[in-house]
Swiss-Prot record:
InterPro entries: Ribosomal_bL19, Ribosomal_bL19_CS, Ribosomal_bL19_sf, Translation_prot_SH3-like_sf. This is Large ribosomal subunit protein bL19. Keywords: Ribonucleoprotein, Ribosomal protein. It comes from the Bacteria. NCBIfam families: rplS_bact. PROSITE patterns: RIBOSOMAL_L19. GO terms for molecular function: structural constituent of ribosome. The keyword rRNA-binding does not apply. GO terms for cellular component: cytosolic large ribosomal subunit. One of its GO terms (biological process) is translation. It comes from Thermosipho africanus (strain TCF52B). Belongs to the bacterial ribosomal protein bL19 family.
Length: 115
């Protein structure tokens, strides 16, 4: 058995079921974290602006406009144990794989809805 096959077998065990989403979609990511001795879940809702990597190491970047109009971006590993669940709020229709141009856009961003 080659090392590549061994890595694939181990990755298959780690992969959990997540909904299908693409850049342009608005998602709500529920993140679990420890605060002292208790665990809390916090939701982070925003537009997926990029997805990169493959397999177990796949990551996605979510951007939202926070308080005072300041943009906040978070990069999440797709199969991380800290992610409780991912909800697709809205499906967006875009023609790019990376939506980094949204960083310069001020105000509300218009993304057409995919059916």
């Amino acid at each position: 058995m080659s090392m590549d096959n061994l890595v694939r077998i181990i990755e298959k065990d780690q992969i959990k079921d997540v909904p299908e989403f693409r850049p342009g979609d608005t998602v709500k990511v529920y993140v679990r974290f420890k605060e002292g001795n208790k665990e809390r879940t916090q939701a982070f809702e925003g537009i997926v602006i990029s997805m990169r990597g493959s397999g177990i190491s796949k990551t996605f970047t979510v951007r939202r406009i926070g308080a005072n109009g300041i943009g906040v971006e978070r990069i999440f590993p797709l199969y991380a144990p800290i992610i409780e669940k991912i909800e697709v709020v809205r499906r967006g229709k875009v023609r790019r794989a990376k939506l980094y141009y949204l960083r310069e856009v001020r105000g509300k961003v218009k993304i057409k809805e995919r059916r």
